[in-house]
Amino acid sequence: PNLELHDLMRQFTRQIVQGKSKDFDASQIILVCGAERSGKTLLSKKLAKFLPTHTAAQNSTLILQNNRVIADPLSGDLNSLFKSSSDANVTSLFRKRQDIALDGSRLIVDYEGPMDLLNSVLMRLETLEHKPQVSVIYTLEVGKSYDAVRQALEVLQIPNLSVALTKMDLLEVSISELSAVFDLGTKIQFFSGLKTLEDGLDFAKISVVEDFLLDIVRQDGL
């Protein structure tokens, strides 16, 4: 392709690929949300298995904590779960769950609640005195139209939300889908489905998306 077209593709790619994020790296809680059967449960497991864990000090020894996964709607009696008093902390949110302890591990939430309640969940997390660093990942199954992708992402309206493209072992992402992500100013952070859970987690890379676009350009003879 000519240099001008190559530069345009590079600019386009840089707008839609998240790249390394210090905020995400520091996250204590990662909420994974998405449509039913969009691959969010598998992605939650991948994140827990392959993301680095924080370390916790115990008797002057650094203990590596395993990341935890819970599947939870975070709904019901939310007012009793979220505390704003001086003793508020992340563990009070899940105090009925014996398997939860944020003592160095990350908590990956496979979010099972309605999407229209997710903003409420995030707002209440912000009211905790010991504010946890929270990231939100939306699992977007590839193989959809421009309008379907735009509609799915538009209704969320969650700041700093990033996307994981899922089921990429079954279908190839289209330029229409990438264009919808671009038009909404959303960033892609993960590719899921290119490898099995045992093989690893794919962070979205600018070079990978550029190569994909270049292949399409070559096929079209541009």
Residue ranges and their predicted role:
Residues 1, 181-222:
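NTP-binding/hydrolysis catalytic cores, primarily Walker-type P-loop NTPases
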Residues 29-53:
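Glycine-rich phosphate-binding P-loop
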Residues 115-122, 147-151, 173-176:
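Conserved ATPase-coupling elements of RecA-like P-loop NTPase cores
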Residues 49-63, 69-70:
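Post-Walker A helix-loop "phosphate-sensing" segment adjacent to the P-loop in P-loop NTPases
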Residues 22-24, 53-56, 85, 98-104, ...:
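Conserved catalytic network of the ASCE P-loop NTPase/AAA+ motor domain
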Residues 1-27:
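Extreme N-terminal, non-catalytic leader segments
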Residues 133-140, 157-198:
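Conserved beta-strand/loop subsegment of P-loop NTPase cores
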Residues 33-38, 63-124, 128-130, 138-142:
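Switch II (G3) loop of P-loop NTPases
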